[in-house]
């Protein structure tokens, strides 16, 4: 056995070994078969990972004072903080880039959906139109399926590097770059340099952040950065920047206005900025009506069937979804935990995966209940439907929710005393 003279060093060594053991167990958990031919436990691995989080947190609580004493001796300047966050972003970009490019080079991508976007970018380069022959087995504009003009913003890069690998790296870049608005928001709310780095780590280590890239590029990957920049611009009262990032957010997809609308509602009811909140609400409602009208009139129609469990007739639509929410809220609430089928537990696993890692900093709003408004899309868009992929962290449907969650987390941490903030933020980083 090793003899370590100082008790604090012994504690830190213990924590390091425990945390390494937890990480190895977590990796092994993904290769374990949680059942047999007759029964498969869909949340076995999720529950296993949760238990590992508890073990890691208990180990941290035992050594937290020693860890905090070490970090208290580290004093970072503003410039050094930016450098550290930049390094975090670059490493995250490299990780996502390597994983997704490896998927492409090893023929692990599927035609649906990576083949669609790889062909679409080549068609954009050659013809200027956002068309594919893959998406619906005929030459068709992607606008017929999703109204996503945001794809054009990355076209200049594809002109220079016209390769399918570039398409994957565009996604990696857009998912890594939100560390910039996260740092800007942290500094605006006067979080310490170390706390700003911790929040950046919470973002990049959050399971759904990297998980959302594992089904390859989708337009959703653009929105995290734009929504966070929009929140920052509104808080700083930078009108030009707010307009630019609001427009860019809306351009991501026909359902993107929902998230801008929620931001507007939050600014209105939290009394942060009623005027700009109302503007966001009105602008997003108008854009939503326009985008859905375009897809419905000139395309194949918006994919409202994903909310089919809220229809009361077979050929329902969004109107019936709203009617169900208003007329039968009890039924609507029951759908939040209703799984895809009777033998599935996908929503339970999804809720655990999304909430456990950030619960320590997400549900500490005190009496500022308006912040829970930022969680409404998580409930309405991801949990209400029984469409399987909407509540799966390995698909792209969480990027908008992640942006709103990170914003709420920053607001919550800003209201905490320094000791509580350090403890809870570190717990979230560990998980």
Positions of PLM-derived features:
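Hydrophobic, aromatic-rich transmembrane alpha-helices
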Residues: 1-2, 335, 346-372, 376-379
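Start-transfer (signal-anchor) and selected internal transmembrane alpha helices
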Residues: 1-98, 193, 276-279
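Short acidic/glycine- and proline-prone juxtamembrane loop motifs at membrane-interface regions
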Residues: 211-220
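Specific aromatic-rich, kink-prone transmembrane helix
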Residues: 181-184, 202-205, 220-246, 263, ...
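Hydrophobic/aromatic-rich transmembrane helices and adjacent perimembrane loops
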Residues: 41-53, 372-420
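Transmembrane-helix motifs of polytopic, lipid-linked glycan transferases
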Residues: 165-190, 229
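Membrane-interface alpha helices of multi-pass inner-membrane proteins
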Residues: 199, 228-233, 240-268, 282-286
């Amino acid at each position: 056995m090793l003899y370590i003279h100082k008790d604090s060093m012994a504690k830190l060594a213990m924590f390091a070994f425990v945390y390494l053991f937890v990480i190895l167990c977590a990796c092994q958990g993904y290769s374990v078969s949680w059942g047999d031919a007759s029964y498969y436990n869909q949340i076995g691995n999720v529950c296993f990972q949760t238990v590992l989080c508890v073990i890691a947190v208990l180990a941290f609580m035992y050594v937290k004072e020693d860890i905090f004493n070490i970090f208290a001796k580290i004093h970072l300047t503003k410039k050094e903080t930016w450098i550290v966050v930049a390094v975090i972003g670059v490493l995250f970009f490299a990780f996502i880039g390597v994983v997704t490019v490896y998927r492409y080079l090893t023929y692990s991508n599927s035609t649906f959906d990576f083949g669609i976007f790889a062909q679409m970018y080549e068609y954009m380069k050659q013809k200027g139109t956002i068309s594919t022959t893959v998406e619906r087995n005929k030459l068709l504009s992607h606008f017929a399926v999703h109204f996503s003009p945001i794809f054009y913003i990355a076209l200049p890069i594809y002109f220079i590097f016209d390769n399918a690998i570039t398409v994957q790296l565009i996604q990696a870049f857009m998912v890594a770059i939100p560390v910039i608005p996260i740092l800007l928001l942290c500094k605006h709310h006067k979080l310490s340099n170390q706390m700003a780095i911790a929040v950046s780590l919470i973002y990049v280590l959050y399971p759904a952040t990297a998980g959302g890239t594992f089904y390859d590029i989708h337009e959703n990957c653009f929105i995290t950065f734009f929504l966070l920049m929009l929140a920052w611009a509104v808080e700083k009262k930078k009108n030009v920047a707010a307009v630019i990032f609001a427009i860019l957010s809306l351009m991501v997809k026909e359902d993107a206005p929902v998230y801008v609308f929620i931001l507007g509602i939050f600014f209105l009811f939290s009394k942060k900025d009623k005027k700009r909140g109302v503007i966001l609400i009105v602008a997003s409602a108008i854009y939503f009506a326009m985008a859905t009208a375009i897809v419905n009139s000139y395309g194949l129609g918006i994919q409202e069937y994903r909310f089919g469990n809220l229809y009361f007739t077979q050929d329902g639509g969004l109107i019936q979804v709203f009617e169900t929410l208003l007329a039968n809220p009890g039924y609507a609430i029951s759908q939040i935990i209703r799984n895809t089928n009777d033998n599935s537990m996908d929503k339970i696993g999804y809720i655990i995966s999304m909430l456990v890692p950030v619960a320590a900093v997400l549900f500490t709003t005190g009496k500022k209940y308006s912040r829970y408004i930022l969680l409404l899309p998580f409930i309405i868009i991801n949990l209400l439907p029984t469409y399987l992929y909407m509540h799966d962290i390995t698909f792209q449907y969480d990027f908008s929710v992640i942006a709103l969650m990170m914003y709420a987390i920053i607001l919550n941490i800003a209201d905490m005393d320094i000791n509580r903030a350090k403890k809870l933020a570190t717990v979230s980083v560990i998980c």
